[in-house]
């Protein structure tokens, strides 16, 4: 007999301990995936009216949420909810950390956010010449300071003033 079996006796389903009373208990097991924050990366345009919401997936529902630089943005989070709203204040990178406080040794989920002004614009036209007095559709693509293309949802706050010089 090994040492572990000597220390804690085991009983089969048919054996009893003869305690003089029944021992009954219940155990509820709930399997929960580790918390996850989506998206893992987002670049947002620096504008005081801009807000971006991260989604918290899985986990117990009770989280500790933090950002690594409150000078760059404000974090809006209500305990028990599954969304984190970020309001930018200054340009720069932020790390958003979400830890499940109900699950011991759970993995911390991290998302990165870049708050950026437009670093570069690309203008695409179907042709190179336009006749005087006519019009042409152009496509403008904006990139952040690290060269990432802004997602479509960020263009609503950008005011492009494109001037054309006719020679």
What are these regions (language model features)?
Residues 1-167:
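Extracytoplasmic soluble-region selector
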């Amino acid at each position: 007999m090994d040492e572990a079996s000597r220390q804690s006796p085991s009983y089969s389903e048919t054996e009893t301990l003869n305690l003089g009373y029944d021992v009954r208990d219940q155990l509820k097991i709930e399997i929960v995936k580790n918390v996850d924050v989506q998206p893992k990366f987002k670049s947002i345009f620096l504008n005081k009216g801009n807000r971006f919401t991260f989604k918290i997936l899985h986990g117990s529902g009770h989280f500790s949420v933090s950002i690594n630089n409150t000078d760059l943005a404000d974090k809006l989070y209500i305990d028990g909810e599954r969304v984190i709203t970020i309001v930018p204040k200054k340009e720069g990178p932020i790390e958003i950390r979400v830890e499940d406080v109900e699950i011991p040794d759970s993995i911390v989920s991290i998302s990165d956010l870049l708050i950026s002004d437009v670093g570069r614009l690309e203008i695409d036209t179907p042709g190179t010449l336009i006749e005087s007095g006519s019009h042409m559709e152009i496509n403008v693509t904006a990139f952040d300071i690290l060269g990432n293309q802004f997602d479509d949802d960020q263009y609503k706050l950008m005011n492009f003033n494109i001037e054309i010089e006719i020679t």
